[in-house]
Amino acid sequence: MNSPALPLSRGLRIRAELKELLTLAAPIMIAQLATTAMGFVDAVMAGRASPHDLAAVALGNSIWIPMFLLMTGTLLATTAKVAQRHGAGDQPGTGPLVRQALWLALLIGPLSGAVLWWLSEPILGLMKVRPELIGPSLLYLKGIALGFPAAALYHVLRCYTNGLGRTRPSMVLGIGGLLLNIPINYALIYGHFGMPKMGGPGCGWATGSVMWFMFLGMLFWVNKASIYRASQLFSRWEWPDRATIGPLVAVGLPIGIAVFAESSIFSVIALLIGGLDENVVAGHQIALNFSALVFMIPYSLGMAVTVRVGHNLGAGLPRDARFAAGVGMAAALGYACVSASLMLLLREQIAAMYSPDPAVIAIAASLIVFSALFQFSDALQVTAAGALRGYQDTRVTMIMTLFAYWGIGLPVGYSLGLTDWFQEPTGPRGLWQGLVVGLTGAAIMLCIRLARSARRFIRQHERLQREDAEAASVLGR
């Protein structure tokens, strides 16, 4: 008669874990939406200056955003390592770790900014950009390049606060950055308040300025809030330590490469579609923009799962870590069911929000169908990747991601969309079908990898427990 107690207990446990995940994920999601909104504001304000300015900003985005994701992705290892130390109750050990991560940011932030500053012109040349757009695009990119050092330092501090389970600072500063971006854009694009009239390139200098504001704001917050004092982050100082920075790079660089691979494949598909009819290009951009917006929620869940898995592993609870990953993936799938259903039902209305042109609406609506289809695989792969970051299992994840996107998705999409190898070329539909295949492949491989990693950690923990018990029994004799 007591059998119903177990399901009830499990149900309460699921609800408690889901509450923890959503509490972590909600501020992250708002911060990500604020960042996305900054890009939207840039596009609107540059577009009001002229189509020429908007084109320059769009070209610049195709260069700096993948590079930015590579840089910040490399620093994401800080979240998992801080989360594990926090879960283990090792607050004093967190400070030295984060200080070494800041040294790493001081290296790759300026280096990434220098690469963006000096290599943007050759990249634009390889892209065969119209000569009249090169100058404005370069000016736009140089403003952003000056903000890269601040962005790297900010992301380390953000990973630190997120790893402690404190996600509110990134939300507040994300909203603050958005609110500051608008007046700076207004001043630099249109030449108000005594500032030079820069047009679209002013967006880049505004973004670079906001990056510095967000870093200084996070630095002030972490330095003043009492919750962070136990880590003694700024009370001591050490030179760079290879023994600490090496593992950060070993875990973080594969994350950066995987994120770069995922973002760059969308850029490549945009370039492949760029040679087609302008209505096709517009429809593709609408579907892609809306897909990126919808992706923010499972992405935020994935970051929250990283923290929860890290906390549980640090506390010596590998079964709870696996449980947190499972609840996170179930929540992501539940969201995918809702988002996919709404996208299928409202695809034409969604497209009409972006354009009044019937031809563009028809193309965008047809592509949103494929976006709805990959909601499930996209939600699974990003949540599984977040859980694997919590396990600090990133190298194999990177290989799987590269293979899924570049070894499966892109070749399938290219074959179906732009060649007659299997049928008449279907244009953007074929390329989006390739995305569905690639994301599905990534989801399957990452879920299998996650199950194996979770099982391995549980076995290792149980083996250590048995060894400790045997050692204790020997000493007790």
UniProtKB/Swiss-Prot annotation:
Compartment(s) where it occurs, according to its Swiss-Prot or TrEMBL record: Cell inner membrane
Membrane topology note: Multi-pass membrane protein
Keyword Membrane annotated: yes
GO terms for MF: antiporter activity; xenobiotic transmembrane transporter activity
Chain segments annotated as transmembrane: 21-41, 56-76, 104-124, 133-153, 171-191, 202-222, 253-273, 286-306, 326-346, 360-380, 398-418, 431-451
Major location category of this protein: membrane
Any Gene Ontology biological process: monoatomic ion transport
Keyword annotations: Antibiotic resistance, Antiport, Cell inner membrane, Cell membrane, Ion transport, Membrane, Transmembrane, Transmembrane helix, Transport
Pfam families: MatE (PF01554)
Cellular component GO terms, alphabetical: membrane; periplasmic side of plasma membrane; plasma membrane
InterPro entries given in the database record: MATE_fam, MATE_MdtK, MdtK-like
UniProt record similarity statement: Belongs to the multi antimicrobial extrusion (MATE) (TC 2.A.66.1) family.
Stated role: Multidrug efflux pump that functions as an H(+)/drug antiporter. Confers resistance to benzalkonium chloride, fluoroquinolones, ethidium bromide, acriflavine and tetraphenylphosphonium chloride.
Protein name per the record: Multidrug resistance protein PmpM
Species the sequence originates in: Pseudomonas aeruginosa (strain ATCC 15692 / DSM 22644 / CIP 104116 / JCM 14847 / LMG 12228 / 1C / PRS 101 / PAO1)
Gene name tied to this protein: pmpM
